[in-house]
């Protein structure tokens, strides 16, 4: 596999290691970073698998930190897309590495060249990573952004780099031709709170988890509607983060996406002292 030929005891910054990994697929750099963070590669791989499970990567099992063929080291296009989405959404600095065409290390002695040719040919490309092994074939997770629409195209098992890039280009072209990014039309009168029975607080503050924008068929974004589903009242206790209802994003054919509405804060069951205080306050107000 690709490497930068790290020497025992050699020191590089994490920034330099990430350049080597993201630009030129340096497997030795990936293992070195795994050992630095996890203490050993196997421990780091355990963390990789735990994180994959958290993200919902149901068909992925990592056996090493660099992606080379190994018994039981498996993934799918769907899972690679989930992982890519997580990187782009919550670690956007990755684009600073994956969009670099050429760079150097060791004072210019080591040249890094990106194998993602879409960086030079595709409008709006933002990364992400190529990869090739004997079992997986020639692969890519390609990401691109145009007019607030961000897409990820994952291609596995190609027979050549040319086939890989052609397939990724076709997928991205299809996505940009058929879909658009639309504002989620949250109703202006959507409830901010709900009354709570038997609670220390009379009302629960609601948190809407709906994204600012969502995917829509091109030309239909302005026709989207949002419908709020909530109970009339709640009963304590209520834990912070509990799902209270949903905001359903709809088009003419039905629900496109259902986004949870959750409790922004906990509400405990009203204590005796709380009940007594409310009675006293009520009597004071009516006196």
Residue ranges and their predicted role:
Residues 57-58, 69-74, 78-287:
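Domain-terminus/edge residues, biased toward the C-terminal soluble/receptor-binding domains
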Residues 1-91:
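Active-site-adjacent loops and short helices of periplasmic peptidoglycan-processing enzymes
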């Amino acid at each position: 596999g690709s490497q930068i030929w790290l020497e025992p005891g050699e020191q590089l910054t994490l920034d330099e290691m990430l350049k080597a990994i993201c630009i030129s697929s340096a497997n030795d750099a990936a293992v070195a970073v795994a050992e630095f963070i996890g203490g050993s590669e196997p421990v780091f791989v355990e963390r990789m698998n735990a994180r994959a499970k958290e993200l919902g990567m149901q068909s992925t099992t990592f056996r090493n930190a660099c992606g080379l063929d190994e018994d039981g080291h498996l993934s799918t296009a769907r899972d690679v897309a989930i992982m890519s989405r997580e990187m782009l959404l919550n670690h956007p600095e990755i684009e600073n590495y994956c969009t670099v065409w050429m760079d150097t290390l060791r004072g210019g002695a080591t040249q890094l060249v990106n194998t993602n040719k879409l960086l030079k040919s595709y409008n709006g490309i933002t990364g992400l990573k190529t990869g090739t092994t004997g079992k997986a074939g020639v692969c890519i997770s390609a990401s691109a952004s145009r007019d607030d629409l961000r897409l990820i195209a994952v291609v596995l098992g190609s027979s050549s780099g040319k086939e890989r890039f052609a397939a990724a280009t076709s997928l991205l072209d299809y996505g940009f031709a058929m879909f658009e990014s639309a504002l989620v039309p949250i109703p202006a009168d959507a409830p901010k709170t709900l009354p709570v029975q038997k609670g220390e607080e009379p009302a629960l503050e609601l948190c809407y988890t709906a994204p600012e924008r969502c995917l829509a068929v091109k030309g239909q974004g302005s026709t989207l509607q949002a419908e709020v589903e909530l109970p009339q009242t709640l009963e304590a206790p209520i834990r912070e983060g509990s799902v209270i209802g949903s905001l359903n994003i709809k088009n003419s054919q039905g629900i496109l996406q259902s986004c949870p509405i959750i409790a922004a804060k906990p509400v405990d069951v009203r204590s005796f002292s709380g009940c007594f205080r409310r009675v006293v306050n009520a009597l004071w107000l009516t006196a």
